[in-house]
């Protein structure tokens, strides 16, 4: 590992001041933030709260065709992303950007942004620039995460990673370019559609989600945690990593959806909590899949977290208890949607179930 981070920085980080008002202020306040304490997620009896067996994953909301909804939203997002990154000089970096950005993927984050915007009274067109911005940043983070100095991954979305095709130098530049493009795209395309004060808030929310109070913090602690003895690391430590590294961008996607749709402060907080729950859920399931599925099924290298000595939920609490945590988080996410129009909330209920039951 080329990057060395000392674990003492973890304790210093969580004691630091100056975080955003709505940020995760301490790994010990998980219950306050999401309604789920580390221990409460492990209290299901007799395995009854585990992830539903294959074939039953759609029972939570069988009347809503989430598969069709997801396909249609992904098509809309893909078309908007394609237009946002035309081929132009310098061609090599533009090709590298397009290679990763248009490589497919589930588009969970832009879908979340759009679904939330529609939930609070907005529409897809109003949310699309923010949805694309979130996906650009997500792709940027994947390009950088896959680098040899980070996770050293060879496959992403079933294809060779960006640095394997274009080289490490070009991959770094492509990731940087996507990060800058995200903010330019959201502000320029939304001009005239969203009030300036709301756009300023959206920019701040997104910036905080990916900086040292968000994604960067999670990645730093993740790197520092490699090869740690799981017996000496608590569940709160792992949740801190993933509330920042994974959930922070999902949280931003949801909050941006509310902002773009003209939602209220109360709606922002409810959907912020929903996103935190599905963010943790996404990572728990990701850890489970890493040790239960093949490389072909995942579209990325299976077992790489184990080989890298990373902290994961199965490593820390075991496979069965990880499944219990996942189901608990799914239910907690759905509870945040109570009080909304059920028909408009249906995509978000189905999204939580989809994340819990996905196979890649």
Swiss-Prot record:
Residue ranges under compositional bias (Polar residues)?
36-46
Transit peptide residue numbers: 1-39
| PROSITE patterns according to UniProt | POLYPRENYL_SYNTHASE_1 (PS00723), POLYPRENYL_SYNTHASE_2 (PS00444)
Query: Could you name the domain of life of the organism this protein comes from?
Result: Eukaryota
Task: Report the main location listed first in the record.
Answer: plastid
Among Gene3D superfamilies, the record links this protein to: Farnesyl Diphosphate Synthase
EC main class here is transferase
Tissues expressing this chain: Mainly expressed in roots.
Residues the record lists as binding Mg(2+) 2 = 145, 151
Q: Does this entry carry the keyword Transferase?
A: yes
What does the record give as EC number? 2.5.1.-, 2.5.1.1, 2.5.1.29, 2.5.1.10
UniProt entry tagged with the keyword Protein transport: no
Kindly list the places in or outside the cell where this protein is found, as annotated in its UniProt entry: Plastid, Chloroplast
Pathway stated in the Swiss-Prot or TrEMBL entry: Isoprenoid biosynthesis; farnesyl diphosphate biosynthesis; farnesyl diphosphate from geranyl diphosphate and isopentenyl diphosphate: step 1/1; Isoprenoid biosynthesis; geranyl diphosphate biosynthesis; geranyl diphosphate from dimethylallyl diphosphate and isopentenyl diphosphate: step 1/1; Isoprenoid biosynthesis; geranylgeranyl diphosphate biosynthesis; geranylgeranyl diphosphate from farnesyl diphosphate and isopentenyl diphosphate: step 1/1
SUPFAM superfamilies in the record:
Terpenoid synthases
Query: Which is one GO molecular function term here?
Result: (2E,6E)-farnesyl diphosphate synthase activity
Any one GO cellular component localisation term in the record:
chloroplast
Q: Where does isopentenyl diphosphate bind?
A: 106, 109, 138, 157
Q: Which reaction does it catalyse?
A: isopentenyl diphosphate + dimethylallyl diphosphate = (2E)-geranyl diphosphate + diphosphate; isopentenyl diphosphate + (2E)-geranyl diphosphate = (2E,6E)-farnesyl diphosphate + diphosphate; isopentenyl diphosphate + (2E,6E)-farnesyl diphosphate = (2E,6E,10E)-geranylgeranyl diphosphate + diphosphate
- Coiled-coil parts of chain: none
Q: Quaternary state and partners of this protein?
A: Monomer.
Which function does this protein serve? Catalyzes the trans-addition of the three molecules of IPP onto DMAPP to form geranylgeranyl pyrophosphate.
The family annotation for this protein states: Belongs to the FPP/GGPP synthase family.
In Swiss-Prot or TrEMBL terms, this protein is called Geranylgeranyl pyrophosphate synthase 3, chloroplastic
Lineage of the organism? Eukaryota, Viridiplantae, Streptophyta, Embryophyta, Tracheophyta
């Amino acid at each position: 590992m080329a990057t060395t981070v000392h674990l003492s920085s973890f304790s210093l980080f969580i004691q630091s001041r100056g975080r955003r008002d709505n940020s995760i202020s301490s790994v010990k306040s998980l219950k306050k933030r999401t309604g789920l304490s580390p221990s409460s997620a492990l209290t299901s009896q007799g395995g009854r709260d585990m992830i539903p067996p294959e074939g039953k994953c759609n029972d939570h909301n069988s009347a809503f065709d989430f598969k069709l909804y997801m396909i249609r939203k992904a098509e809309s997002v893909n078309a908007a992303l394609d237009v946002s990154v035309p081929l132009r000089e310098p061609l090599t970096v533009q090709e590298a950007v397009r290679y990763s950005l248009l490589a497919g993927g589930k588009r969970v984050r832009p879908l979340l942004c759009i679904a939330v915007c529609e939930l609070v009274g907005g529409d897809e067109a109003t949310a699309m620039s923010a949805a694309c911005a979130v996906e650009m940043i997500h792709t940027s983070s994947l390009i950088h995460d896959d680098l040899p100095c980070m996770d050293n991954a060879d496959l992403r979305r079933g294809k060779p990673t960006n640095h394997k095709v274009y080289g490490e130098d070009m991959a770094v530049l492509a990731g940087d370019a996507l990060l800058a493009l995200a903010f330019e795209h959201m502000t320029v395309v939304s001009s005239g559609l969203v009030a300036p004060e709301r756009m300023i808030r959206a920019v701040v929310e997104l910036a905080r989600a990916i900086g040292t109070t968000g994604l960067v913090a999670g990645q730093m602690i993740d790197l520092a945690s490699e090869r740690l003895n799981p017996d000496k690391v608590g569940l709160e430590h792992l949740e801190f990593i993933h509330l920042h590294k994974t959930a922070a961008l999902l949280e931003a996607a949801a909050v941006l959806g509310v902002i773009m749709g003209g939602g209220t402060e109360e709606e922002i907080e409810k959907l912020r909590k929903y996103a935190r729950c599905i963010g943790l859920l996404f990572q728990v399931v990701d850890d489970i899949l890493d040790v239960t599925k093949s490389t072909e099924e995942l579209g990325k290298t299976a077992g790489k977290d184990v080989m890298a000595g990373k902290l994961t939920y199965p490593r820390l609490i075991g496979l069965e208890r990880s499944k219990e945590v996942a189901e608990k988080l799914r239910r907690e996410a759905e509870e945040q949607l109570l009080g909304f129009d059920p028909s408009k909330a249906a995509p978000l209920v189905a999204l939580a179930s989809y994340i819990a039951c996905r196979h890649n």
